[in-house]
Amino acid sequence: MTRRVKDNQVMFMLAVGLLAWFVPGGGHLLLKKKKHAIIILVTIVLTFLIGIYVGSIGVINPVGAKPWYVAQMLNSPAVAILGYLSSTGAYPVYARPNEIGQIYTSVAGLLNLLCIVNAVYLAHLGGIQTTRN
């Protein structure tokens, strides 16, 4: 494999990974797997929105719940905006709604991480197949 082809493949895999992080399912859409992309988008967005619905925007807490926030950030960089809005303390959440909301939003982020890894792996396999042909 020539260096130029290898560099192009790395850049393509990076683009797939970043797009999959910015928009859940976006990496699969770039790989022309429309059905997978739609399923991933609907699943992750609904899981995240259920967590926000149960616990309000206050479950995204970059100050008091950093481990949960890291998992939530795997959904999309848009979570950083929500974290900024909720860091003022204007959206207090306590007890079960807080816990359930954090769990749902964090699980959505971790699920998106699996989908990002899968999209990058599929891009890698596609690059290997094109260089062998």
What residue spans do the PLM features occupy?
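Transmembrane helix recognition focused on a "late"/terminal membrane span
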Residues: 1-17, 40-133
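Long, hydrophobic N-terminal alpha-helical segment
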Residues: 5-35
